[in-house]
Amino acid sequence: SIDLIFGLPGQNLESWKKQVDKAMTLDVQHISAYGLIYEKNTPLWRQMKSGKVIPADDETALEMYDYLVETCAGNGFEQYEISNFAQSGQESLHNIVYWNYLPYMGFGSAACSFDGQRRRTNAETIEDYLKGSAPSLEEIATRTGFAEAMFLGLRKTDGVDLMEIKRRFGIDACEFLAAESASFIKKGLLRLDGKKRRLSLTEHGMKFGNEI
């Protein structure tokens, strides 16, 4: 498994194509690829704000993503999430747990655990963690859990099982998000399969998943 990052300062479409083409020659079964994010107050963000680094423009970043998707598909990699591609049977079970909003355990300083109803975050520093400092606890309200399950589930190419969402949270997503989902469906960004009761991003919508 390898991770790739696109939209780097100074990176152009041709250099990205060479990196993707090189990845296809490696003996890997899983590829994760992420667009670079300039997190506020990080050194890279400050360099961008001062003009020391110039981020890739949105159009180029979309072209990079398109090339990745097309090349992966042509080389036996199935896209199963916005940023993840795998050979048959090689999907990341670890990450699928997150996208399906299932319980998980985190160990070590600053690690987070989730039991389906609450989140527990361990002490941030190693020193405090080794001292046995109590973790912070966050109770997840029903509406919050619903929203988190929806946006995480929509990252998957097969989208969200609306019947499962209703069973877990008692909320009919189609009714609750009627106005928003109708608008995105009309724009060709979301797809509603009434028979299977699944809501998913379209191929075009995958490019704008964070905004949706």
Regions inferred by a protein language model and the residue ranges of each:
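Short, amphipathic alpha-helical interaction segments positioned at domain boundaries
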Residues: 204-212
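Minor-groove-contacting beta-hairpin "wing" of winged helix-turn-helix DNA-binding domains
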Residues: 197-202
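A short, conserved structural fragment
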Residues: 81, 185-196
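Extended hydrophobic-aromatic, low-complexity segments
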Residues: 162-163, 175, 192
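Short amphipathic alpha-helical interaction segments
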Residues: 171-186
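C-terminal scaffold of the Radical SAM
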Residues: 1-171
